[in-house]
Design a protein with these regions (language model features):
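Short low-complexity stretches enriched in small and charged residues
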Residues: 1, 30-38, 67-75
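Extreme N-terminal tail/first-helix region
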Residues: 1-14
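Short helix-to-loop capping/linker segments positioned immediately adjacent to catalytic or ligand/cofactor-binding
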Residues: 4, 19-24, 101-105
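A generic structural micro-feature
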Residues: 9, 24-26, 58, 108
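Short beta-strand segments
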Residues: 12-47
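Short, structured beta-strand-loop surface elements
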Residues: 48-120
Length: 120
C-alpha cells in the first residue's frame, strides 16, 4: 500500500463501500463515513432500531470493497468484522461523544459497527 493510501486511511472521511447483496448476489454501493480510532478502521452510523441493508449484507458476506475517494482514489479489498459484543461496542463508540451523540447506550444498542481490515 502506498503512502498516500496509508495517509488517507489514518483519518476518517467519506468513502463508498461495495457489498454483495445477500439475496441477489449483486454488488451494492453505498456512501458512508469511516473512522480511524487508535489505528483501527471502523464503520458506524447513527443509531436506528432497524438494521441497515449494508450491515446485513456484510453479516452474510464480510468481503467488500472499500473505495477511497476525493484526493486519494483507491479500490481496496477489505473484510468486515461485525462487532456485536456490548462491552466492545461501548469501548469503541465512547468516541461518539465527540461526534455529539447524547446517548452512548442507545448507540451501543442500535448503531451499526464494523471493524475493517484492508486485505493484502
Amino acid at each position: 500500500m502506498n503512502d498516500d493510501i496509508l495517509a488517507a486511511l489514518s483519518e476518517g472521511k467519506v468513502i463508498d463501500i461495495t457489498t454483495t447483496g445477500r439475496k441477489t448476489g449483486e454488488p451494492r454501493r453505498k456512501e458512508i463515513v469511516f473512522h480511524n480510532i487508535g489505528g483501527r478502521i471502523y464503520i458506524s452510523g447513527v443509531p436506528r432500531e432497524r438494521k441497515r441493508d449494508w450491515l446485513v449484507n456484510l453479516e452474510a458476506d464480510p468481503h467488500f470493497v472499500f473505495h477511497l475517494k476525493g484526493d486519494v482514489v483507491a479500490d481496496l479489498p477489505a473484510t468486515a468484522r461485525v462487532i456485536d459484543d456490548p462491552d466492545e461496542r461501548r469501548q469503541v463508540l465512547a468516541i461518539a461523544e465527540k461526534w455529539g451523540w447524547d446517548d452512548l447506550e442507545d448507540g451501543v444498542r442500535h448503531s451499526p459497527l464494523v471493524e475493517v481490515t484492508i486485505d493484502d
